[in-house]
Amino acid sequence: MSDTREMLASMAPDELRSAMRTLGYRTQNDLAQAIGVSRSAVSLWLEGKVGVPRPVAMLLRMLVAAQRRVY
């Protein structure tokens, strides 16, 4: 996998927090319900204990980009 693809696939906890703020998710539970995962999964991602799955990272980045285009 190229470095660019790896960079796009991974999402650091700080980027996840930023995406949550941008998209209006105030709690881990809010995000978990919106994307259909458990709150504990979101917690593990935010703590950096488990990586954010590539499809989730890509979805959140697309939603953030769309949100920014609206404003």
Describe each region flagged by the PLM.
Residues G36-G51:
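Recognition helix of helix-turn-helix/homeodomain-like DNA-binding domains
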Residues D30-A32:
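Short alpha-helical "recognition helix" segments of helix-turn-helix
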Residues T27-Q28, R39:
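Helix-turn-helix DNA-binding elements, focusing on the entry/boundary residues of the two helices
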Residues M1-G24, R61:
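A short, Lys/Arg-rich alpha-helix, primarily the initiator
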Residues A9, Q28, V52-P53:
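Alpha-helix N-cap/helix-initiation sites
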Residues R54-Y71:
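DNA major-groove recognition helix of helix-turn-helix/homeodomain DNA-binding modules
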